[in-house]
């Protein structure tokens, strides 16, 4: 893969990802940017931690296998509504499913080799694995009422887009670390430069 090509949304597009979330309108405008920054930072810090733990490995199939997570491929173009899905991480089954036809379309659109595209998608899913196995769900760092009737609020829900923003940040930061475009500060796996 070209060292300059990275097909996931960057930090500058993270707010757009948040705007697409159905709960976006429930977040006060003055808090939106801060929520995005926090989710992005969680992904960056997790990437630094994992990069050091894996000693810079960039083979996410092997990283998953080392953690007892199976990676399966289904030969489908998985589209629901207007959304194309490339993969799923099922924590209860400890399995990642890759949707081959969807990935091939995405790889072609982004001038990527199929295996490189799979690895990038697996890096994104690895963040979701981390969320379910110690990191905590990024979608819950900010919660909004499920239902509001006048001044009465019922229930609380997280913001799914924050988890996706964290996963994009993880994949982006890990990619940059592997390609020597970023580094973790010495002595601290918790901070990236």
Task: For every predicted segment, state its role.
Residues 1-70:
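N-terminal leader/presequence regions that precede the main folded/catalytic core
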Residues 5-7, 11, 57, 103, ...:
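Metalloprotease/metallohydrolase-associated module, dominated by Zn2+-dependent proteases
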Residues 43, 86-88, 167:
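Long alpha-helical scaffolds
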Residues 61, 69-71, 80-81, 137-138:
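Polar low-complexity intrinsically disordered regions
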Residues 72-119:
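Active-site scaffold of zinc-dependent metalloenzymes
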Residues 112-123, 156, 160, 164:
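Short capping loops/turns at secondary-structure boundaries
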Residues 119-121, 125-141:
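Catalytic Zn2+-binding segment of zinc metalloproteases
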């Amino acid at each position: 893969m070209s060292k300059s090509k990275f097909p996931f949304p960057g930090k500058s597009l993270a707010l757009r990802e948040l705007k697409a979330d159905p709960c976006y309108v429930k977040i006060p405008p003055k808090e939106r940017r801060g929520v995005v920054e926090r989710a992005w930072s969680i992904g960056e810090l997790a990437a630094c931690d994992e990069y050091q733990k894996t000693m810079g490995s960039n083979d996410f199939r092997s990283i998953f296998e080392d953690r007892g997570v199976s990676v399966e491929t289904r030969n489908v173009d998985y589209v629901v509504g207007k959304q194309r899905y490339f993969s799923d991480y099922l924590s209860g089954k400890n399995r990642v499913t890759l949707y081959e036809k969807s990935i091939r379309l995405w790889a072609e659109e982004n001038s990527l080799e199929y295996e490189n595209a799979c690895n990038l998608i697996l890096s994104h899913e690895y963040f979701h694995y981390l969320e379910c196995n110690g990191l905590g769900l990024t979608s819950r760092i900010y919660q909004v009422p499920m239902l509001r009737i006048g001044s009465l609020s019922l229930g609380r829900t997280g913001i799914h887009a924050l988890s996706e923003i964290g996963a994009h940040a993880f994949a982006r930061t890990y990619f940059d670390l592997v390609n020597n475009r970023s580094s973790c500060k010495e002595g601290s796996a918790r901070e990236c430069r």
